[in-house]
Amino acid sequence: MALLKEKFASLPEFLRGPVLACIKNPEADPFFRNAPHLLVVHAKEGAVTPTEDCVAACAYFDILMQGCGYGTTWCGFLKMIVDAVPEAIDLLGLPRGTPFYAMLFGRPDVTYLRIPPR
């Protein structure tokens, strides 16, 4: 969060609101929604379709976790933050310019009733 505070003026307008909420209330978590786990998928250097590889891996992980009773959400905010502040990728331990995407997952707090199969 310190890096985002430092780079606040250079952030795109749509990221300033959530960052400001975190600055005003350190308990707020508009980016990760208090999810217990973060999965970061990245492509190898030299991959033919690195972005598509990351999306496909996340899609399969999403299906797998749903089948195991976990809730998932795609974490586009992390990608937007790294796009706006490239040095933030260092916090993930990835080389700069590495294609990646992230997902949050954990046991859901709520359950949804579904209509029965027909």
Please annotate each region the language model reported.
Residues 27, 83, 100:
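Residue-level signal for pocket-adjacent positions within structured domains
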Residues 1-50:
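Glycine/small-residue-rich phosphate/adenosyl-binding loop
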Residues 98-118:
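C-terminal helix-cap and adjacent tail motif
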Residues 37-89, 103:
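Small-aliphatic-rich amphipathic alpha-helix that forms the alpha element of a beta-alpha
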Residues 25-26, 86-87, 110-112:
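A short, acidic/glycine-rich surface segment
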Residues 67, 89-94, 116-117:
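Short alpha-helix boundary/capping motifs
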Residues 30-34, 91-96:
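Solvent-exposed alpha-helices and their adjacent loops that cap or buttress functional pockets
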